[in-house]
Amino acid sequence: MQLSQIEREQLYAILEKYDQHPKVQEMREFIQHGDVTTYQHCKNVVLVSFWINRRFHLGADETALAVGGFLHDFYLYDWHKTSSFHGLRRLFELHGFSHPGSACVNAKRYFQITKKEQNIIQSHMWPLTFRHVPTCREAVIV
């Protein structure tokens, strides 16, 4: 599952302004899974999403797909640290439920993202994020 050199160049041209932002670079400081940083995880998600769209001719908006995929975990905290909340509130403060909202707030704070890109970010953990359902093909792909 690899993009061609031309496809990679096209993808990186879309992501360049985001990738160069200091806040995006902060994602390199946080571990996502195992020894994979949040930054590398987001990059992997974008590469796979872009590949799926191209190989299956899904016709997704590639800019929205790339931006939403790249920023989907732009939450900027160590999710392994435990919360101080208890009971039902703690359940909904758990990372799996709450991080898409945090990532979307950050993405809107530092970039002008579209409604479609917001939906990609907010719904990427659906059905855990039951209030944020994927409403576009790009969100389903991510």
Language-model segments: residues:
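Metal-dependent phosphohydrolase cores
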Residues: 1-142
